Regions:
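N-terminal leader/linker segments that initiate helical-solenoid repeat arrays
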Residues: 3-57, 62-72, 82-83, 106, ...
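Residue-level recognition of tetratricopeptide repeat
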Residues: 25, 59, 93, 127, ...
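Repeat-based scaffolding regions
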Residues: 28-32, 51-52, 169, 224-225, ...
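Structural motif corresponding to the intra-repeat A-B loop/turn of tetratricopeptide repeats
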Residues: 30, 64, 98, 132-133, ...
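Alpha-helical adaptor scaffolds
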Residues: 127, 248, 320-321, 423-481
Length: 540
């Protein structure tokens, strides 16, 4: 059994399990997941009974996509009752891969007893029955405390199972219900349903799922119209693929909350274990890995989906994000340009390009991309967010007059959107223009979103620069309480406190701001903390 050395100076055999484990821990801390994975694999082989090695190996293996190591680690943890709840899902995936239907059913029973993922049981059992060759539709007990949660996932699987059984009328009804309930991954779901319908002769119904003049669907529409590649995209889902669809959807759903992002990655990885050729799990995993800081793995996952295929555009979009997260910004921008240049490119492609260009300080290019994204909308129905993006790029690119016109248009279209009101109001305050109207915009924004520290700061700073110090100080104190690590807010508070005669507190606020400030701002804060407030030291 692996144990820590008795003394800090004790030598460790470079070939030992302990050495491999320590190397893995160091690699974990240094952000070298590949080395960490190899080290934990070696450590577990050298000491297969070590719970600590198994625990770290399990998490690293699932995140990294090594199913064999994940299953070995899970077996060690299970023997001591330490297997994480998602480990049961992993073991179900393993049983489905082996076509061990009785074993899969026993594991589902355990999943129900454990509680966390019990709501997945009716649909999972139904897919197991598909594998057994004696199909039984999912049955959700209305008295079950998880019934409402399980029903969120039901229609999608009823549709796939009806398609498998050739029951097109019931499949179409379930498809319509499933699409009506979904808010994410809509394009991928439309594609898989369209492929299934087209392969069963429902060509018109398949095409109806794929909007015209959208690049994401161009290849699929062309193939369906010509009858090409339908056997590939219309294969009936297996038990494992059905389970993978369930986990992929759950991974996407729970990962809107950053606190559950790592669990979402593990679920998407398990889905890919049981359906390695399915594109959706790889696309979702790429997205979640990128957002969680695992850019190298995200790139690998996105590239698992063939670029020329039906799902290629969706995977390439995630590849852009992963490349940017990995610091490969030139490559990301090049790919984003290529995706935005195709016929009928969706607005999202232009927005993605614009955001990357803005991050590289190419504000004119960014504004142009955001403007192009608006082209497909009627003039009075352009989404306010696209106008805000364009206005922000123009403002940062020193084209204030054009920016103001765009931002004012956004405010007319979205008069109760606090983000728009805040940007337009604060930009005018910064330039000391239209001050009274700008303060009113910020008051309205703050009333609409009183808990937003950034908006509270904007209003407090506007009150300060217009001379209402008595109103400004408590407003800025509230902003700083809500965002204590924000350098701009703390500097604003310090300036206002100084003007109110509260010099000690002002210096305290400036010191708090200096902790997070850089460059010119850090120099300015140091100067006024040392010398006191002077006109040339005023916050920008």
């Amino acid at each position: 059994m692996l144990v820590l050395p008795a003394a800090a100076g004790a030598s460790v055999d470079p070939g030992s399990a302990l050495h491999a484990y320590m190397r893995g821990r160091l690699a974990d801390g240094d952000g070298a997941p590949g080395l960490a994975l190899n080290s934990y694999r070696e450590a577990l082989a050298g000491d297969p009974a070590s719970l600590e090695v198994a625990r770290r190996s399990y998490f690293q293996a699932v995140i990294s996509g090594d199913m064999a190591l994940a299953l070995r680690s899970a077996a060690v943890l299970e023997s001591d009752g330490l297997l994480p709840r998602d480990g049961t899902l992993l073991q179900i995936a393993g049983a489905l891969n082996r076509k061990d239907w009785p074993g899969a059913r026993l594991l589902v029973d355990r999943m129900v007893a454990e509680g966390n993922f019990a709501f997945l049981a009716p649909i999972t059992r139904s897919w197991i029955s598909v594998g057994e060759g004696r199909y039984a539709p999912p049955v959700i007990d209305p008295a079950d405390r998880f019934a409402s949660l399980a029903r969120r996932y039901l229609d999608e699987h009823l549709a796939f199972q009806a398609l498998r059984n050739g029951d097109l009328p019931n499949a179409q009804s379930a498809i319509n219900r499933a699409l009506a309930l979904r808010t994410g991954e809509m394009d991928a779901l439309r594609l898989i349903f369209a492929g299934q319908l087209a392969a069963r002769g429902a060509k018109a119904e398949a095409l109806a799922l794929l909007p015209e003049k959208e690049a994401n669907f161009a290849q699929a529409r062309a193939d369906i119209a010509s009858g090409k590649a339908l056997s590939l995209h219309g294969k009936a889902l297996t038990a494992g693929q059905g389970f993978a669809r369930l986990l992929t959807r759950l991974a996407s759903d729970i990962s809107s909350d950053g606190s559950t992002g790592t669990l979402g990655i593990r679920l998407a990885r398990i889905a890919a274990f049981v359906d390695p050729d399915g594109p959706t799990a790889h696309i979702v995993a790429a997205d979640l890995l990128s957002r969680a800081g695992h850019a190298a793995y995200a790139i690998e996952e996105a590239r698992m989906v063939p670029a020329p295929g039906w799902y290629g555009a969706l995977a390439q979009a995630e590849l852009v994000e992963a490349l940017a997260a990995a610091g490969k910004r030139a490559e990301a921008i090049g790919l984003a340009r290529a995706l935005a240049a195709v016929p009928d490119a969706e607005p999202e492609r232009h927005v993605r390009l614009g955001q990357l260009l803005a991050q590289e300080k190419d504000f004119e290019g960014a504004a142009s991309a955001f403007r192009t994204a608006q082209a497909g909308y009627p003039a009075d129905a352009v989404p306010w967010a696209l106008l805000l993006f364009e206005g922000s790029a123009l403002e940062q690119g020193a084209h204030w007059n054009e920016a103001r016109a765009v931002l004012e248009r956004a405010a007319r279209l979205a008069p109760n959107e606090p983000t728009v009101l805040n940007y337009l109001g604060y930009a005018q305050i910064e330039r000391r223009q239209n001050m009274d109207a700008a303060v009113e915009l910020l008051k309205k924004a703050s009333a609409l979103k009183p808990q937003d520290s950034s908006i509270t700061d904007s209003l407090g700073w506007a009150q300060f620069v217009t001379g209402d110090i008595d109103a400004a100080v408590p407003m800025l104190e509230r902003a700083a309480a809500g965002a204590p690590a924000d350098a701009t807010i703390n500097e604003h508070l310090g300036d206002a406190l100084w003007a109110a005669g509260r010099r000690y507190e002002a210096r305290y606020a400036w010191r708090a701001a200096a902790v997070f400030a850089e460059g010119e701002t850090a120099q300015r804060l140091a100067a006024k903390t040392r010398e006191g407030m002077k006109p040339e030291y005023a916050a920008r």
